[in-house]
Design a protein with these regions (language model features):
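N-terminal small-domain helix-loop-helix segment of the aminotransferase-like
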Residues: 2-99, 106
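Conserved core of the PLP fold type I
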Residues: 61-161
């Protein structure tokens, strides 16, 4: 049998997968379930995205892209941030990935040294502590409060360091 890396023993089994499996089981039994587990949207892919994907495939855009995303997509994201969120980010400041967890994990792997402490504001997504551990870091959970809209305040951050 193949022996797994010692780093795998540092993490727990996925609570997301466990909850998703339970939600699917209960749904299959006819129960009315709203699953907040796997982060899957409860709507289909918007028509304009479907059409853009089909157009890209027909244009032969089926090869690997730049590691941080296609320049035209990064530019579109930059424009979206400006028009919809009143945020100014240059395309060079944007990195596109397959999902939020993947981007966060890449950042952790690129920046953590063994036993670096990573502050995780609570509430948090269940995977974050294990992602930190897998990257060699040590998670430190810092509680946030509803009266602060669950945002980590500067004083809370200072007190946790």
């Amino acid at each position: 049998m193949i022996e797994l890396s010692k780093s795998v023993s540092k993490i727990n089994s996925s609570a997301t997968i466990t909850m998703s499996a339970l939600a699917n089981k209960l749904k299959s039994e006819g129960q009315d379930i709203i699953s907040l587990s796997a982060g899957e949207p409860d709507f289909g892919t918007p028509k304009h995205i479907q059409e853009a994907a089909i157009k890209a495939i027909k244009a032969g855009k089926t090869k690997y892209t730049n590691p941080d995303g296609m320049p035209e997509l990064k530019e579109a994201i930059s424009q979206k941030f400006i028009t919809e969120n009143d945020l100014k980010y240059e395309a060079t400041q944007i990195s596109v990935g397959t999902g939020g967890k993947q981007i966060l994990y890449n950042a952790l792997m690129a920046t953590l040294n063994p036993d670096d402490e990573v502050i995780i504001p609570a509430p948090y997504w269940v995977s974050y502590p294990d992602m930190v551990k897998l990257a060699g870091g040590s998670p430190k959970i810092v509680k946030t409060a509803s009266e602060n809209n669950y945002k980590l305040r500067p004083n809370d951050l200072r007190a946790s360091i």
